[in-house]
Amino acid sequence: MGYDLYAVKPNSEKFGYFRSNIWYWIPLWNYVAILSKDILTDDDIEEGNYNNDHIINNELSVIIGNRILESFSNNVFKDFKDKFEKEKEGLDKENYKVCSNSNNNTISTESFYKNYILDKDLLEEFANFCINSGGFQIS
């Protein structure tokens, strides 16, 4: 599953489209929500987690992009990323019941949350998309 973002009125063809798979998008959008909780509505934040064609207008989009870029230079991103990675390291294994024929076994596996990735390069690409998209639709 992935998230396709379509620019409303891009400055150029380069900024017409942005895509992320779920493992990268969820941490990215959570970071955006934290940086932008004073400008995004609860509905904006919630809808960012779904492919419901929700639109973030140009004004908000530009602010989001600028805040992301600023967070790289003032260590907000670094601090958030360090905390994110530390939390992932601390996750316990998860137990699952496995039924096959007459055996009921329990297996342990790494938490699926460890698959989430907060990637600075992707976040920078998203920030530039936001600034130049004219607003965007999350599909």
Give the residues covered by each predicted segment.
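Acidic (Asp/Glu-rich) sequence patches and key acidic residues
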Residues: 1-139
